[in-house]
Amino acid sequence: MADDRLIVALDVPNVVQGLDLAERLGDAVSFYKIGLGMLTGGGLALANELKQERGKRIFLDMKLFDIGATVEAAVRGFASYDLDFLTVHGDPQVVRAAVQGASGSGLRILAVTVLTSLDRADLDANMIRAGDLAEITLERAARALDAGAHGVIASPQEAAAIRALPQAAGRLIVTPGVRPTGAALGDQKRVATPARAIADGADHIVVGRPIWQAGDPRAAALAVQAELPTRG
């Protein structure tokens, strides 16, 4: 049985390629992430096919960021697709609106803290306040959780510190920026292995290219799951 702690990112351009990859992965994967790049290529149709016809769990990675009323309405629309996770940016007003939009459904709202493709130099270049990157991530996580987020998206390097927050009890930590042992970093800068991410408190890890670019994606997915610690 697939380990649902692994979420495979379907970072492919259209539904046909997404379904082809899901077919190749078969029962080795039970949880998929569909991102913004796929949305115009039929992402919601793909989500519906995987969820309703194949029994997979779906994480829609939209990183919504707008005024509260707009976010609430958008989330209410997404909730009608019976999704599992949806991302918003971690501004408290956005989080509160998203949680309200998801009320009455099983959709969990995850707040983005600091993208795993960014480092301190990137924050400086974008004039984001000075400070330790881990400290900024922790502050953003705490604010989002205080606003009612069901969980946060953060680098595996910050997972342990977030898990130690009082607000994080019973909340989800989902970590992109996870690379299997020996895999190339790609565009990720703050990374860890699957084993390290889970050991440090992540509930789910997100892995994309190391799986879907592999010659045998199914074997690659199973290899990632083999790196995960045994469930306690």
From Swiss-Prot:
SUPFAM superfamilies: Ribulose-phoshate binding barrel (SSF51366)
Keyword Lyase: yes
GO BP term, example: 'de novo' pyrimidine nucleobase biosynthetic process
Entries under Pfam families matching the protein: OMPdecase
A cellular-component GO term for this protein: cytosol
GO molecular function term, any single one: orotidine-5'-phosphate decarboxylase activity
Keyword list, A-Z: Decarboxylase, Lyase, Pyrimidine biosynthesis
EC number: 4.1.1.23
Catalytically driven reaction(s): orotidine 5'-phosphate + H(+) = UMP + CO2
Protein residues bound to substrate: 11, 33, 61-70, 116, 179, 188, 208-209
Similarity comment text for this entry: Belongs to the OMP decarboxylase family. Type 1 subfamily.
Its job: Catalyzes the decarboxylation of orotidine 5'-monophosphate (OMP) to uridine 5'-monophosphate (UMP).
Record note on quaternary structure: Homodimer.
Name used for this protein in its record: Orotidine 5'-phosphate decarboxylase
Organism annotation: Cereibacter sphaeroides (strain ATCC 17023 / DSM 158 / JCM 6121 / CCUG 31486 / LMG 2827 / NBRC 12203 / NCIMB 8253 / ATH 2.4.1.)
Gene that this sequence comes from: pyrF
